[in-house]
Amino acid sequence: MAPSAGEDKHSSAKRVAVIGAGVSGLAAAYKLKIHGLNVTVFEAEGKAGGKLRSVSQDGLIWDEGANTMTESEGDVTFLIDSLGLREKQQFPLSQNKRYIARNGTPVLLPSNPIDLIKSNFLSTGSKLQMLLEPILWKNKKLSQVSDSHESVSGFFQRHFGKEVVDYLIDPFVAGTCGGDPDSLSMHHSFPELWNLEKRFGSVILGAIRSKLSPKNEKKQGPPKTSANKKRQRGSFSFLGGMQTLTDAICKDLREDELRLNSRVLELSCSCTEDSAIDSWSIISASPHKRQSEEESFDAVIMTAPLCDVKSMKIAKRGNPFLLNFIPEVDYVPLSVVITTFKRENVKYPLEGFGVLVPSKEQQHGLKTLGTLFSSMMFPDRAPNNVYLYTTFVGGSRNRELAKASRTELKEIVTSDLKQLLGAEGEPTYVNHLYWSKAFPLYGHNYDSVLDAIDKMEKNLPGLFYAGNHRGGLSVGKALSSGCNAADLVISYLESVSTDSKRHC
């Protein structure tokens, strides 16, 4: 029997392999599929979602990876709307109430620059330096501004002083990527601000001019409603946790399209006589199959961490393609510790998002990077009689501490929460997950990593790289990276299809 028109169209569609089922890979697969391409996602682990992991247990709901995201990327809006997740979007209560530990005590962080200047959070000298920054740095010569290897701490200290670095920048980078301002490259960690200095000298003046420029208004599109503006500014999660996002994409993929426990062993790029483009052959292995399996594809999106990519065998037109040009990537280790305390045992419960701990606060006995007030943000995450906290330990600040045992981590977290929130006694519940490679560290020599990714893409036709090794570490950036790679694949396949028709 001849296949139906729909079946024939499906079988004749180009095939694309996506390696890795984290948020980047799943976003790429979703966009490719709605474009009509055949997609196969290979995931070495037994579950999809990457570092978006939500757990529901004994009336508690917590995230072991990212806890929130923002809608600053257009691709995030596209996916949420396409997947019908608006009704499941969950915004934290009092998310503008964020605290910074200072002298061993949590201090409410002013929610905007004007309130910061009016408050006592910073010294008079630091506030004066902030006020004078637009004047002192206006039209500075290029020789006096940041070079591509300058650290985050060096950049912000030049503009705003050491106190701002110690009590604003340091806790911020620790809380967002587990890094520290001395190890991070300004060029790669905050490219927008780095470019503003190049253009305007003053970061504050540049930010104001950039926001008010007609080009920026045009880029932002038509006027947004207040609800849309709130969505784009604020952090959010989903009912059930962040994994709700990746689960929704997985539901759209058939079992043969999402291959869990399927490890890619070899990739081979070759050009056949009857094809005008390079095709890809992928050999993968699964525990439930005795023999490895070989399949052909028209393009590949690679989202695996570079440390895993280096272990793959890749051939190009019959010859080994060595990946020895990929440098060693420095990764940040992190432990995520979940605790609950009876409400009556927390003497100073703070309403808000959470508290961050600057490095300097270690002199006051604080060892954690920060704590999210999970059940304060999302009351449905815990029963009414307990508080649920998510605490982060380790990072580049203290790599060894990230690897500590659960018993030691419990003592560290309990001690910090006692000092910061007045939590007394033992927690009623403790859990933790150790991420040995939580984030790639955008360090001073990260150019070599980006150059290696570019070289890999340039020398392997039809292969595109996506993920948080390039373009940003946030969930939104990683998701957008996957969507962008999908767009590049679509353009690539359309261009080679046009070229092949010209040769007919």
UniProtKB/Swiss-Prot annotation:
Protein name as catalogued: Protoporphyrinogen oxidase, mitochondrial
Source organism phylogeny: Eukaryota, Viridiplantae, Streptophyta, Embryophyta, Tracheophyta
Cellular component GO terms held in the UniProt record: mitochondrion
GO molecular function per UniProt: oxidoreductase activity; oxygen-dependent protoporphyrinogen oxidase activity
Catalyzed reactions: protoporphyrinogen IX + 3 O2 = protoporphyrin IX + 3 H2O2
Description of what induces expression: Oscillating expression during diurnal growth. Maximal expression in the dark period.
Pfam families cross-referenced by the UniProt entry: Amino_oxidase
Activity-regulation annotation: Inhibited by the herbicide acifluorfen.
NCBIfam families assigned to the protein according to its UniProt record, in alphabetical order: proto_IX_ox
Region feature Disordered, mapped onto this chain: 213-232
Keyword check for Plastid: no
Pathways per UniProt: Porphyrin-containing compound metabolism; protoporphyrin-IX biosynthesis; protoporphyrin-IX from protoporphyrinogen-IX: step 1/1
Keyword set includes Mitochondrion: yes
Cofactor(s) the protein requires to work: FAD
Binding site for FAD: 20-25, 43-44, 51, 65-68, 264, 473-475
Domain of life assignment: Eukaryota
Assigned EC number: 1.3.3.4
Family (UniProt): Belongs to the protoporphyrinogen/coproporphyrinogen oxidase family. Protoporphyrinogen oxidase subfamily.
